[in-house]
């Protein structure tokens, strides 16, 4: 027992030393897939939000965890193997057509969003996706964490489409910081408008396909969507 406690203390000290000196071990990350998250992870996500986002645009963990309980595909995260804590995540919400229009108009905040505005992936169908948050802890923003997480999101979208016929027609998101705008550009999203609350709305269309992606997972995703569009063209 004493040996276990000593090892735990050493690991905790080592983790704090790495973070204090901003020494991030190369690629020591693992993806936390949607079904593997717990409430404590959402508290950690909230703490990351407070470091990088505007306070008035942050949804508390009680709200985000309720989204996750309603549809556990709403969140995908990445964790440090060293600290065993989430260090970044995507919030990707399948939303109603009405909410999509509200977000597109520029008059909406995440903490106003309830499960009434969300959809479950319970039937094969076409869905609109709201990327409510893309966050990486500041200490990990110059590592491979974002690319690992981004590719995991694309992999999840491929699997939803090919295995369950869950197709995303439109993606929309809101950038409130310079880092958020950077992420939107990396994601290949186009700016749609500037809002009156000093944010920018970005978006992309998958059906008909216009989203430009460069990664191997992105190329695979859009190849599949282009084939599906040709198959279902009469619906659009």
Describe these PLM feature segments.
Residues 14-63, 70-71, 75-87:
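Short amphipathic alpha-helix that is part of the acyltransferase structural core
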Residues 87-88, 193:
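A structural microfeature
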Residues 91-135:
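Conserved acyl-donor/pantetheine-binding loop and adjacent beta-alpha core of acyl/acetyltransferases
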Residues 1-37, 159-236:
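Terminal substrate-recognition subdomain of acyl/acetyltransferases
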Residues 71, 123-125, 162-168:
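Short helix-terminating capping/connector loops at secondary-structure junctions
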Residues 77-79, 91, 203-206:
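Short, well-ordered beta-strand micro-motif
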Residues 131-136, 141-159:
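Conserved acetyl-CoA-binding loop-helix of GNAT-fold acetyltransferases
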Residues 65-67, 92-95, 151-153:
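Amphipathic alpha-helical scaffolding segments
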